[in-house]
Amino acid sequence: MTQDKPIVETISNAGEQVTNVFGQFWQLVTSKNTTNNGDSKPIKIEQLPIYAEDNAPLKQKFLPEEPLPLQREFATIRIACEQEYDRVAERFKVVDCAMTQTKKAATKCNAYLTEEWTALPKAAAITVGGMAGFVLGLKRGPVGRLLTTTIGLATMAAFCYPIEAVDVAKTGRAHAEQTWYSFQESPTPSAIVKTNLSPPK
């Protein structure tokens, strides 16, 4: 009958085994690191990448847009026209300058005519009103023609310039009232100086 080992010895043997296992594991880990470090080649600082993405560039693929029907033909015609115009404009700069100025003047004239409440349409309307008054007064003699023409011009001017017509009417009324009041008031008679016609004494 064999005698069992004491418990203290058993615990010490287990501790030694665990220590040996950890030592072997540490040797394996350190040996792998040393071999890997030995295989790497040293590089210069200038060769190090600034960003991590430099080592793995992204592959990009651009898909060209398919042209529409007749797009290439129109593009060819447009490019040819532009080239011809540039060539002609370079040789005839005076003609190009004149064409540009004419285009600007035509644009300004069109904008002026199409804009509302400009002087030209108003002048045309006032002229038409005066001509209508003149035609209506043909059978009334010179005074009648002058009167109807003046009435036609004044009527169309009042329609075209309503604010100014109101101001003129107010001013005329004020002057008329002042003239009427002045006419109604009789002037103050001056003191009559009697002349002494008796002979001197």
From Swiss-Prot:
Query: Which InterPro entries does this chain map to?
Result: MIC26/MIC27 (IPR019166), MIC26/MIC27_animal (IPR033182)
Location comes to: Mitochondrion outer membrane
Biological processes per GO annotation: cristae formation
Q: Which domain of life is it from?
A: Eukaryota
Gene deletion effect = Abnormal mitochondrial morphology with localized swellings and tubular extensions, and distended cristae. Double knockout with fzo-1 or eat-3 RNAi results in mitochondrial fragmentation. Double knockout with chch-3 results in reduced or no brood, poor growth and withered gonads which on a cellular level contain fewer mitochondria.
Task: Give the residue range annotated as the organelle targeting sequence.
Answer: 1-31
Q: Pfam families, alphabetically?
A: ApoO
TM ranges are 118-138, 146-166
Known function: Sustains mitochondrial morphology probably through maintaining cristae morphology. May act as a component of the MICOS complex, a large protein complex of the mitochondria.
Return the similarity comment. Answer: Belongs to the apolipoprotein O/MICOS complex subunit Mic27 family.
Per its record, how is this protein called by name? MICOS complex subunit MIC27
Gene behind the chain: moma-1
